[in-house]
Amino acid sequence: MGSIRNLLITGSNGFVGQSFLNYLEKLEERELPKKIILVNRSESKPISYKIRSRTEIISLTADLTKEWKFDTESSHILNLAGDGSKNAYTEEAAQNFIKICENLEIWALSHKPKVIVHASSGACFYGDSNNKNFINKSNLILSRIKGEKILARLNIELGTRVVTARLFTFIGPNILNKLHYAATIFIRDSMRSNLINVTGNPNTIRSYMHESTMSDWLANCLLNEKIEGIFSVGSSNPVTIRELAEFISLKTNAKIVFGNTKIEPSTYLPNNESNYKTLGLSEGPKWQDSVTECISIYSKRGMNLD
């Protein structure tokens, strides 16, 4: 990262942004970008002294769905702006995401960054419109696909290296603030009520890459010239919701109640074998170790997470 002159991060207040900043905090001073510009809709969350004492930090407030009027030189962009809440599947959130991508394209045409890493969704692999998982998430998926196409044009127009990072599911300390994800819900409920309520099909398949590994992969996307176009970020190690619930139950002694198994199960899993072989990337810690870490953290500060 030390070769990056100016790194612009949009949406740094979100889960991915906070995880990435935690990742930067662990780097040596020589490994940090020379300057980091943070752009958020609201005031940027506080930056640790370990980062701000070793590199220049600029924090800007802007509504990225409107014209980008901030004029700052940026050699590299990590675009994380988007609604990561439970409202992300609404039509309004979808249209706002497209506007952000359109505004980024316009801004990039005049500022000419060398590299853009754009956070999209792993759900974009749903291509069959008859698939219920596609239909239920169609607002999000179609907006992400359109955003990918908009920003891909910059490779042709400017020669900018554009990486579309399709993000899957993750685990780690920062995800504990997201109370609409299964892992967080299970951990919270097991600690508070000694009960894990599995409302969906327990055979649904997810994977759980640690947030620090996710951040390392995003850093590779920014730096490695071999990475271009669509790039899946996530673990290829399958974990059923049943396995997740049973492991958390084992660690917390919580009872499990399984709901409607007639709900169609879904598989949300990347195939990253080529990433390991050609790029030397690692999947990081075992998901069980990451979940255990989160249980430990929640037990210490869980009452303050809602």
Q: Where on the chain are the PLM-derived regions?
A:
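A conserved pocket-lining segment of Rossmann-fold NAD(P)-dependent short-chain dehydrogenase/reductase
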Residues: 162, 167-170, 185-209
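Short-chain dehydrogenase/reductase
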Residues: 94-95, 136-148, 176, 180-184, ...
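NAD(P)H-binding glycine-rich loop region in Rossmannoid oxidoreductase-like domains
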Residues: 58-99, 128
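SDR active-site strand-loop-helix element
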Residues: 10, 39, 77-81, 116-122, ...
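C-terminal substrate-binding subdomain of Rossmann-fold SDR/epimerase-dehydratase oxidoreductases
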Residues: 194, 199-306
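Conserved Rossmann-fold NAD(P)-dependent oxidoreductase catalytic core, especially the SDR/UDP-sugar
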Residues: 102-139
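Conserved beta-loop-beta element that borders a ligand/cofactor-binding pocket
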Residues: 121, 148-174
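N-terminal Rossmann NAD(P)H-binding glycine-rich loop of SDR-like oxidoreductase domains
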Residues: 2-30
